[in-house]
């Protein structure tokens, strides 16, 4: 029984001493008594290499490098005693989840938390923490009973104790956790003859848990000799840099006292690691209160970067430079970080420099395609075949790889399913996946070509293949009722999918292609899946459970799976966190992300038990728990100290001034402390360095091209750029080894999202030799020529979705009102409420099933929406009844179509216009309602357009003038061209151009205004027609029969003053002005169509009233217009003009007679 402690500051040769000591014993007696070197898990590989790489050793059977858990198994192999099944972390969490589900009603505080998957993990961590510090459920219960705790704390501890106790009851005698096996190891240590002959060395730890101290005490008691290495100078002060390892030393001394033996301490004072004085000075004075600054020899550096990406790019360049100029191998370099976002950055950036690396971090398997496939499959069953999980299942491409162009087929399937709203068992109903159904997909209604038919057949085959697998999986799962049956069913389903052989084939292919990391991932995923199934069987065996419970437990297990990647090569940069990474004696260590808030880190408690509760527990029970946040905060300087003393020759600190999300960051206060140690240690700004020495950016061809691009871009923007970059461009352009992709990259220098004017032949090929178009198409061109080009030239369309869009709603109202209008022949004024309701019901039952493949009957929400549509229609008809009772105009036509060649007498003729190039312009469309009024030989016509949006239902004469609103003038022109077809006299004149807002009014009144008359008034006013009226006195009273002096109409935008004159707020114009607006509108058509055929496709949106069409445009991702830098492209409207005055310059010639 012997206990030794090797203590000393970092780099004083403690670890070297024990390794040399072990090597010497191995040389002297290779078959002697056992030697065990205990180290943290992440350090065992490095220490094994120290022995394997020593050429003076010819092999030995006596030395093993183990961590505590592996040591316990080594003893169990000798003495037995561990009969129970080992329970993994995932298995324990599943058991905890099952316990809290069963005992939910008994929980005091956490009753509402049990449904959250992450809660079982929190409980696991807390219980594991208790076990590490030897706190049993009984001790917890005693503590709760004997102390007057706050209600919340009491209930919290009662809940944890309840789960902990049930967990122990389940585990006891059948299973064993890691902590339990270590406890058993302590109990059985005295039976091991192998251990009694062993010499134990413990290195790489700074502190231990209570359980580990108990193991150390037993090792000292039963082993021949125990030697512990601690990095400390022996200072026991609470605020000492070495507080943590000094506290461990105190515990080791207590162990010696407990066993009544002497602790042999050996202090190491001579610094051996550092080969440069400035590194020695850094280690010796980092925590010194008094020191003498010295000049740095360039082996301690501090780099300042504008952002994190620039920081890692610079580190990568420096590593390549060291490798090339100093012959330094990658394995002699390490990068330590603390902010997790740096890990993702390095995984992204280092491969661009072809730098081999190994990052010592476990990553979740959750987002791997194989895992996503499994979890999506589970969610499909849980949600009853909902769209989202099913499409995720398809898109993983795991089950569909055997199909050629599977991703393309899946895209088509997604478009089709989105459009048709396929859900649930409709996925396996052939009538929804008939080839003819695909013919109707999107905007296409033409017969299918043979190629399209063959593609759609392959889509259906792919869908059917996957659905058979889903049904097989569901069937097997549905037939199970116990855990073992569920696990068996799951495995059999995977076998039926041929998944194991497919994955092994994929793995072998990746290995052959040199992608060993991806190949290893597939192995780990499959082994992980099998492990979770094993855990489920181990924990629950033949226990009865529901399908839902099994899938929940299985998903919890999958959440715990992580990749543990072993190094793929020996010569690679080591990357790890400052807290855990074990990198010793490297030639160069980079400490990246040395920012305030990271180093030192702001430590916050994340466990279920707060720091205050921990402290009170420790005070009252004298039981030590894991360190609180304030204790951990005190050890932050020690974290920095350990990280920066890992290098023998060079240490570089770096920090960024801006975080990943654009937040401002400050350098670590430790850096200022380090700067004070030297007389000449200056912060090196990376950007300034590169400006002064551009060659420092040229370490790798790929990255040099990017830097070249940025420099040439600055040069084109008239910034000062070093001539070096122009020389670099010439060299790279003329070197076939370096110019790959250079032309493509440099083309972005002069990229401008300017479109090219189409030549006449191309315009004709796109648009045809005749323009057949609706009014809205011309309005769209006026809003932005490129939008017109994208939608009508390139014919780009968003995929149709199975949901009610605004335009669908407008179409429904139009069709319903047409149906009812024709039924009553426009006689709204004589309808009573009963008739209105009956007509509405009849119209909806006729029309709604035809909307979006019966969308409005698909869900409860849409059925409710159907009722709301009915209510709006009834409200609208009530308003139309009121308006019809107070006007002399009578409805004559509803939904009157017009085109160049009318199909029959019911359609109107649209006389073709002609572009400047002589190309015919055939306008087509549909007028919602035409009202007429006859007075002697004169006829007046009202155009009524139904709008479901108040915004679009306003006639803006400025927009009319600029061609942004062409509809109403076009409709009036068409009607005036078709007098005979409409049965009107030759003296037919324009009456009103009016919009009717179809809606359900929301009337807001104060309590003192709440009366039936006031409500009715507000109701009628909300339906008031908007637009423009003919100001001729012969027609004014026809608009509203109640019109008289001092009267404001509540059905049209018209009012009279006391003297009978028209009020200024009335929306009126004289007859000649209306004709001039119509003619100007025609000119807009000709101008617009001419520009279209001239090939104008400019990205030139028209800005009006501080609004851009871009705000509502679907093509922004195509034109790349940027509101910040493309404002010069906007066309603007002169909003100061009076359109009615500006229009007076139009020469009507013979029109309007």
UniProtKB/Swiss-Prot annotation:
Superkingdom per UniProt: Bacteria
InterPro entries: ADDB_N (IPR049035), DNA_helicase_suAddB (IPR014140), DNA_helicase_UvrD-like_C (IPR014017), P-loop_NTPase (IPR027417), PDDEXK-like_dom_sf (IPR011604), PDDEXK_AddAB-type (IPR038726)
Pfam families (alphabetical): ADDB_N, PDDEXK_1
Other comment: Despite having conserved helicase domains, this subunit does not have helicase activity.
Cofactor names: Mg(2+); [4Fe-4S] cluster
EC number: 3.1.-.-
A GO MF term: 5'-3' exonuclease activity
Record's keyword annotation contains Plastid: no
UniProt-listed GO biological process terms: double-strand break repair via homologous recombination
List of residues binding [4Fe-4S] cluster: 784, 1110, 1113, 1119
Keywords: 4Fe-4S, ATP-binding, DNA damage, DNA repair, DNA-binding, Exonuclease, Helicase, Hydrolase, Iron, Iron-sulfur, Metal-binding, Nuclease, Nucleotide-binding
Domain named UvrD-like helicase ATP-binding: residues: 1-289
Quaternary structure and partners: Heterodimer of AddA and AddB.
Lineage of the species this protein comes from: Bacteria, Bacillati, Bacillota, Bacilli, Bacillales
Function description: The heterodimer acts as both an ATP-dependent DNA helicase and an ATP-dependent, dual-direction single-stranded exonuclease. Recognizes the chi site generating a DNA molecule suitable for the initiation of homologous recombination. The AddB subunit has 5' -> 3' nuclease activity but not helicase activity.
Family: Belongs to the helicase family. AddB/RexB type 1 subfamily.
Cofactor binding note from Swiss-Prot or TrEMBL: Binds 1 [4Fe-4S] cluster.
Chain residues that bind ATP: 8-15
Boundaries of every UvrD-like helicase C-terminal domain copy: 269-583
Protein known as: ATP-dependent helicase/deoxyribonuclease subunit B
